[in-house]
Every structure is written in structure tokens, then in C-alpha cells.
Amino acid sequence: MKDNYILAFETSCDETSVAILKNGSELLCNIIASQINSHKRFGGVVPEIASRHHVEQITVCIEAALEEAEISADQLTAVAVTEGPGLNGALLVGIMAAKTFAWANHLPLIPVNHMAGHLMAASLVDTIEYPAMALLVSGGHSELVYVEKEGSYKKVGETRDDAAGEAYDKVGRVMGLTYPSGKVIDELAHKGQDTYNFPRAMMNTHEVEFSFSGLKSAFINLVHNENQKGNDVIANDLENLAASFQVAVVDVLMAKTKLAMEKYPVKTLIIGGGVSANQGLRERLSAEITDEKLIIPPLRLCGDNAGMIAAAAYIEWKKGLENVQAGLDLNAKPSLVFEDM
């Protein structure tokens, strides 16, 4: 049987990435050009800057991927690309590159939901036993997705306001940390204690929904009130502040994930998205999820990368190209959700 090679593009935010996946499981390369240093001084991603960097890096990444994988264009089976959700201009760079490459090399084009990519990154680590539940947490999303069978996605819960990663970045700015601040907060949290008892929103409801805006506001108000009293709590108690914030976030994520698994019994729990790199969350999951198979991707697959897009595209390819193939009129879908698939 002829080998399947998928060339995938990911440019939804601030990482330019191109990957090649063999037979749905062997990641031959996963080239990632990060833009963190360009956005750091602004305290967050600047869409126009992100798009310009994608334009500069995309061709370099394609060439690097083909060279590292030792694959030529005529060996490829299909081209895959993130169509959304994400930043419109950033998405368009990847889509135009993918369409051009597919057209020039007479290859089918497979559009992929970015969040399905985060979910299917787990398939590059271990075999997913269905049905499965996925906790997807990042700077822009916090949602729980039920996967009854391969390629079937049903969002069963999401945040009502801020995403978990967004809360981390906003709290990080108050703490005086540089963007992105999630890793530093995680490191500080491991040195402190939960002494401030920040609110855990919706913990006692039976709704599979998150809310982090109240926690963020409580953190900001505490810092402000302490400063008014002459207590520079950021300077004097940073580690305990970080620990208190992180424990509150993880408590909510764990509670709602367990609730979702009660409502939708599963064999596997998957974690994905940038916040899945958080050691506090990974430790709690490993300690408390014992009855179901737990798949936590390695750090290299937690952030945005084209390898995960290739993995999701392979699942789509198995459905039959007549059902999933896009035309050259494919456009960006910045607000794409699972229900649109």
C-alpha cells in the first residue's frame, strides 16, 4: 500500500509552522518559527505584525520541512491548512500558501479546524480509545469536546468570558511579567501556597461551563486594595499570589472536566492547547484521572504547530476526499467553531 504523506500549514496566530506526517502517525518534521520576541514588548499578539512575519517565514518553513523530511512534492498525498479559528490576516497567509502549493503540485486541499488540531495532537502520542473527552485550553479558548468516535466532535462546554490562557496573560501583566507569562506564573506557583483563596466561579453548578473573568477581577482588585494600604503585594508576596491564582484556575478546570465526564462517560481524556503545558494542571490530571486513559501531549505539541493540523487532516482524509476536500476558493474563518464542521 502506498504511503500517505500530508503537508500541513498552521498560521492561525503567532507561530508559522509547516509539518509533514507519514501514515497518520509518524511526524517526519514539524518546523515552527516563533514570533514571541516581536510581540513581547506589546504585551500580546499584534495581528498586523503576526501577518507580516508569516509572509516572511512561510516559504522558509516549507523548504525546511521538505528538506528535513527528505520528501519531494510528488510524494505527497495531500495538503492541509488551518482555516480557523484565529486571526484573519494570519490565517490568510497560510491558506494562500497552502492553496498555491496544492494547485502547483496537483494535490487535494484539506481544511482543518485549529481546535480539532489541538485535540488530535494526542493521536501523535498514543492511541485514542473512543469515546473520548478533550479539555482544550489556550489563550483564546477553554472548551470541553466530546468525541464519540474518530472524526466526530461535539462541544459540550466552554468559557462564558475569558479563556484560561487569557486570564493568565492579563494577571501576568498585573504582576509585571513579560508576555507570554503562563510559564513564569506556573514556576512561581510551585514555590508558593494558596493563601488568598480566590473565587472559583460556577463550581457548584451543574453546567459544563467555565468563567475566569471574576477570578481575574478579584486578583486585580486585591493587588489594588493592598497597594492602597501601602502593601506592595507584588513585590512582597509574588509566589503566593501566583500559587493562589493557579490553584483557582486548575480547580475550576478539574471540576468541570470531571462533570463533563460524568455526563458523557468516556474511555480517554485528552488535554490540548497552550495551557496544557502548565505543570500544575498536568500534575492534577495525572493524580486525579485514574479510571480513564489520560493523554497529555509533550510540550512541543502543546502550542500551535502544523503537526497537529496534519494529524487532524489525516482523520478527515480517511472520510474520503469527496467529503472533505476544499476548492481554491477556500477562505479564512476566524470565528470557526466545531458546530460549523
UniProtKB/Swiss-Prot annotation:
Its main location: cytoplasm. Belongs to the KAE1 / TsaD family. InterPro entries: ATPase_NBD, Gcp-like_dom, KAE1/TsaD, TsaD. One of its GO terms (molecular function) is N(6)-L-threonylcarbamoyladenine synthase activity. Pfam families: TsaD. GO terms for biological process: tRNA threonylcarbamoyladenosine modification. It comes from the Bacteria. It is found in: Cytoplasm. HAMAP family: TsaD. SUPFAM superfamilies: Actin-like ATPase domain. One of its GO terms (cellular component) is cytoplasm. Fe cation binds at H114, H118, D304. It is an enzyme of class 2 (transferase). This is tRNA N6-adenosine threonylcarbamoyltransferase. Its cofactor is Fe(2+). Keywords: Acyltransferase, Cytoplasm, Iron, Metal-binding, Transferase, tRNA processing. The keyword Manganese does not apply. Required for the formation of a threonylcarbamoyl group on adenosine at position 37 (t(6)A37) in tRNAs that read codons beginning with adenine. Is involved in the transfer of the threonylcarbamoyl moiety of threonylcarbamoyl-AMP (TC-AMP) to the N6 group of A37, together with TsaE and TsaB. TsaD likely plays a direct catalytic role in this reaction. Its EC number is 2.3.1.234.
